[in-house]
Amino acid sequence: MFKFGKKLMTVVLAASMSFGVFAATTGATDYWQNWTDGGGTVNAVNGSGGNYSVNWQNTGNFVVGKGWTYGTPNRVVNYNAGVFSPSGNGYLTFYGWTRNALIEYYVVDNWGTYRPTGTYKGTVNSDGGTYDIYTTMRYNQPSIDGYSTFPQYWSVRQSKRPIGVNSQITFQNHVNAWASKGMNLGSSWSYQVLATEGYQSSGSSNVTVW
């Protein structure tokens, strides 16, 4: 969520789940995320398969996306954003949470007028691009476990991903790079989604995830 506008989720389908040994993980989506803080108008459509679309106007904060009920560090996310057109603040991002420790994380491939930043930690090369690594902190803010204090981990692409082409996020590359900076994720994985998020903006998005 935007670091200046954190919110609660409408539906959290994921339960705590710990993993020992992981293999690279792909597969059909099984989780639909559709949350808004009630500001403005957000029209989200849960399409067939891994497709979703959202049109928004003069919103507060919202997040819409498709993904997986149970996360994994080995997730390989494939997607095609046929449309991603924010007017104002918006992200096209791989997004999720861990517990033990409670951490919120992002891999941001595209954005609107605001490119997220934080405390700079370095870079990681992945999937044909270079990402800047940042951390931020949230103090007594809503989370998947109620109001808590927790870090956010970010990988933000230096240049925006092209729209309308098949794209891939190899999450393990980011997990490894974060760990090399002392940014260790938790041992219990909640949901993961390829999301469109907006804050005080308008726009449209149409994304297929697999």
Swiss-Prot record:
InterPro entries: ConA-like_dom_sf, GH11/12, GH11_AS_1, GH11_AS_2, GH11_dom, Glyco_hydro_11. Pathway: Glycan degradation; xylan degradation. The active site is at E104, E197. This enzyme liberates reducing sugars from elemental chlorine free (ECF) and totally chlorine free (TCF) bleached pulps from eucalyptus, sisal, and flax, which makes it a good candidate for the enzymatic-assisted production of high-cellulose-content pulps from paper-grade pulps. PROSITE patterns: GH11_1, GH11_2, GH11_3. Residues 1-23 form the signal peptide. Belongs to the glycosyl hydrolase 11 (cellulase G) family. This is Endo-1,4-beta-xylanase Xyn11E. It comes from Paenibacillus barcinonensis.
